Amino acid sequence: MIIIAKTINYTQEQSIICMKAVEITDIYLQSFADKNTNKKIQYKINDKWFDFDGIRERQAVLPDSLFSRYMYSSLTRIKNSDIYSNFLTVRTSYNVTYRDHEGDKKGVPVSCNDLRNQYYKDGIDYTFIVRNRKGEEIGKITKHFVMLMRNPSKAKKGECIFIEESLFLKAIRFLTMGLYDKMKEQYENAPDTLFNIVGMSAYQTLTTAAAGDGYIQIPLNNILIIKDREVLSDPMKAAVVKSVPVQYRKFEIDFDDPKVEKIINRHDCTFDPETAKEKGCTLIGKSREDLSANGIRVNGKYPGEYHYVDDEKRKQCTVVRADDYEIPNILWDGQGLCDSSIMPEGAEGFIYCRSHFFKSCLFAGNIQEFFKDYCVEHGIDYKTATTEKTDMFKRKLKLCDIKAVISDKSIKWLKFVDLMGGKESKTFRYWRNFMKEHGNWFEIVKTVHHSKLGEYQKSAYQMNNSVPSTDRSILQSVANCSIEYYNLLKNNDAEYLKYLEMMKNRFNINEVLLAMVGWNSDFTKTELFREKKSKDLNKLKNEMMAGRLWQKADNLTIMDNPISMLLTAVGDKAPLNEECFSVMADGVQCYTPKFKDGERLAAFRNPHNSPNNIIHLYNVYPEKLLKYFPDIGENIIVFNAIGTDTQARLNSQDCDSDFVYVTNQSELAELARIAYVEYPTIINAVEEKGVSEYHFCPEDFAKMDNAISAAQISIGVSTDLAQMALSYYYAGKMKSRELEDIFIILSVIGQISIDLAKKNFDINVVNEINRIKRLSCMKSGLVPRFMADAKKIKNPKKKYSEGTVQRMNCPMDIMAEIMEEETIQYPDRVSRMLLRDLFDKDLKKIKADNRKIDNLVELVRGYNDTMKDIRTDYGLDEEDKAYYELKNRVLDKTLKKFGRIDKDGNTNLDQIVVVHLTLMAMRDSNSDVRNTILNFLYQMAPELFLKCFVKNEQK
């Protein structure tokens, strides 16, 4: 089914679509309470019972995207609210036990899996409260919602989006390009048919990604599609992870032993036909099944012996080491190239684009210049040259019209050829027509964004704890950059002001402090400034000691062999001979303008589990890359993926905007070389089970999401478990092959857990993790100090059993000790003064409307409470885009109220109000809201705010 799209203006800004967010357990408890209005419903957390007071409503956002713009005209906003009543975010994050009377000590348990099954099948009835401007209830709206899609960025938290039933078909047909209808029709005609709903559920959400950097329109006739290419490395060391049947001990009865005949004779049975005739016994076969069928129990009295037997239904991982393994790379997996002429204003280096069943990272280069030069060198007429020999679908496109080149890995609809016509050519036409109907628009999910930390970038504890050394002098050098930077900030206010500039945002007080110091340099002596600096540096040191070390480094987006890709595009006979890189024995050649020609580099990619994932790089400056990709900038790195192991080495890396943390720190570069040579590259050889395990029905969608949710949790668990195994390995002087196997296997388990949203594998990741936990070398459960500290920074409520957390002789704990010893404990003494000492004394005499001041202070308190709720109740990480979208929305609404203009044209913030709010903020009783008040005043009335204080020359 092709959907006729109405014209959408993608150049116009669209407001955020806000929706209610609820827990599925609250929905269930509310429905139970509605049926039992005369009973008090309670639910249990740990061992304590709580009264159920109704559904806890939060807010979520549907970001600006192709999907949200398509749906926008059909959406309805609740009166006097910015909440839309057409979507409902539902989190399935915990099981619940409830009861309807206090005498019930155990309660009734209900699992997330059961609730998914119920609500995916039956949908959800949800009631919205309508309020007037005073917040008073004036009505209710009840709507029926049905499951639409998993939230791709929140799969780990078990989050999905339900949609108003009347809009379901419009939405699902857009998301699936009409393939939903085709699947449904096939299912109704043949209910036993199995479908790739795993892939469909993953790829239908591509048009829902936030268009953080706008949109771009590229006609498909300007896009050349080539087939990717598998290339093999030179023979090298590898650690191959395979799945093998779980073995168990099985007792095999020796049925030929005369003792067995005597035992069964007592039950009037026999194996001997003659005995059966003579004594009238029942003749049975020699098997356990025959014994059981005749009521004969098997116990320890039977003769026989134990054997190890394979259980073909249960698999576990094993590591097989090889010295001459040819490791495959898939060239240009998710990568595309675009001519620099089509790069949108403000975009740099690349544009990561998504559209209908499409995602590709388009790197900017002079591709038309390359085509011209190639044609001249090979005697081809550039203006008439066509692409029917190189285009995957044999399209005869003019080479001079090509604006982008992509590989087939970027087009995900190839996985559904059977639904789209049965042939790839028909499938392409289906996609082309759908894209044309919707204007050939692509959302730009991201482009290059430079580090706000300037020449620095933070690393992660997973990286630092994997470097293959426990030598204190070497690790001292690795930690020195962080130590020196911290000490510089400690005793240098000018450097700390630069730090404030780097870390400023709309929500903190950094910009206020910078403005105040610019107004009067004595502000650096105030308690406000000194306390903020002390708090910031304590936080910085704690983060560093927990693994967030600073290095002169950056996160660089990966591109593979673009010259080879262009040679393939023009049909060159030897496209792998691009004359850019050489194969090295102890590393991989690369090109990035970020570092100098000839420098050695260390690179790490997230997810990162072990030294087997570290890559050693040699930076070179190939002439062809300098000529045809002159503007890629310092945030892109070109890998040589031909004849190397880059993708497996970097934990299943591809080129659809994957990035690596890269540094030229000399000790890290040498440790990377050692790791690359001594720790074999991990190969994920666990077999896929196929994709067609499910029927096209709500119950199977729930079954799939239950499995995916369980596996997603395993991503973090496998990473943590790998760090524990790695720490034990280093503490044991790097000798245990068993521990080495564990962090190798867990690296693969992490890969599989991520891919389970799209594929099925011949291993149960939860069972495998539990098996590893039970191994004798892991049973202690000891947690290295740095790891416990990192967890507590993220979740201050995190607790460990007494004696569980220990300092270990592992790289990160050693570096944390070094930092504790080498960092300055106490800063140089500075004379302090109170903030009120710098206040303009003449302004203190002005009288104000105290009621208005009190109302504004309470508004600020409410804002602070809401901000805490967003982090704690919503379970969002600070890096989460939704976290900032929600925070921005709350801040904008509060600032609007804070500086509101009344019907007479009077603003809340005149000089009198600003003066007295500033005085209120300086009171000790208002220390909890001080920073927020000052931040609001500076954002809304910067000049009036600064005039509250004396300038330097007025002293």
Regions found by a protein language model. Name each.
Residues M1-G633, I637-S652, F659, T663-K955:
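Beta-strand-enriched accessory nucleic-acid recognition/scaffold domains that flank the catalytic cores
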